[in-house]
């Protein structure tokens, strides 16, 4: 995964913030807007249920994308690459202009490892805590793999508003609000997947554009 940040001195912190917003994550920006009820017909409900089933049955995937990030008056852009193998993940970040790079890897059921330029390593049992100690950011790593694919979270507790196709349109969970702005159409052997996602929480804003989705071989 490659990351390009205008402010490289804060690259890791901004990137990790970006990742937390990227994934079908929720974001909350000071309150929910009143929503207009959407009618989802029976056919769309069946298609969406089939999509959710497919996502559950295909836990190995990766995506490449771009994100615009803003935290208060600070902003930048990033390249993102994420690989997920079931419960395990590996995220590689690099800022070519500053020659900085980071690798975050681990599992939702095991320890997380964060490696940075110069060989420093931080390891912990909980990914959220590892990232917080390194950056000061709270990143809901346990929810991101579901959010980024528009999958109903196994952890529950969220509020999901659907579009006319029966897909997630807005998601509110864990203090985050997420909006799905565009989707890749379904193709042979693969259902619709998010193409453009916008997330916000307080003064933080992220817009993710996914360039490519891939299914990984176990």
Swiss-Prot record:
Has the keyword Transport been applied to this entry?
yes
TM region(s), chain numbering:
none
GO terms of biological process kind? lipoprotein localization to outer membrane; protein transport
Q: Does the keyword Cytoplasm apply?
A: no
- Pfam families in the record: LolB
According to the Swiss-Prot or TrEMBL entry, at which residues is a lipid covalently attached (S-diacylglycerol cysteine)?
Answer: 26
Q: Where in the cell is it found?
A: Cell outer membrane
Q: What residues show lipidation of type N-palmitoyl cysteine?
A: 26
Give the signal sequence positions.
1-25
Looking up InterPro entries in the UniProt record yields: LolA/LolB/LppX, OM_lipoprot_LolB
The UniProt keywords, alphabetically, are: Cell outer membrane, Chaperone, Lipoprotein, Membrane, Palmitate, Protein transport, Signal, Transport
Similarity section: Belongs to the LolB family.
User: Subunit info?
Assistant: Monomer.
Name of the protein described by the UniProt record: Outer-membrane lipoprotein LolB
Q: Which organism is it from?
A: Xylella fastidiosa (strain Temecula1 / ATCC 700964)
């Amino acid at each position: 995964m490659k990351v390009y940040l205008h402010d490289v001195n804060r690259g890791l912190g901004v990137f990790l913030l970006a990742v937390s917003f990227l994934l079908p994550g929720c974001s909350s920006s000071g309150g929910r807007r009143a929503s207009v009820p959407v009618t989802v017909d029976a056919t769309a409900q069946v298609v969406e249920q089939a999509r959710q089933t497919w996502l559950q049955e295909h836990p190995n995937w990766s995506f490449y994308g771009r994100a615009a990030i803003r935290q208060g008056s600070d902003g930048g852009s990033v390249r993102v690459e994420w690989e997920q193998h079931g419960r395990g993940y590996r995220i590689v970040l690099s800022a070519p202009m500053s020659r900085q790079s980071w690798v975050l890897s681990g599992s939702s059921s095991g320890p997380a490892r964060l490696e940075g330029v110069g060989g420093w390593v931080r390891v912990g049992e909980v990914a959220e805590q590892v990232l917080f100690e390194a950056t000061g950011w709270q990143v809901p790593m346990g929810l991101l793999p579901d959010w980024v694919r528009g999958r109903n979270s196994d952890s529950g507790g969220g509020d999901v508003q659907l579009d006319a196709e029966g897909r997630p349109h807005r998601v509110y969970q864990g203090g985050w609000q997420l909006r799905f702005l565009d989707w890749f159409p379904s193709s042979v052997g693969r259902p619709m997947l998010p193409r453009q996602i916008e997330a916000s929480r307080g003064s933080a804003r992220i817009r993710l554009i996914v360039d490519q989705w891939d299914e990984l071989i176990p």
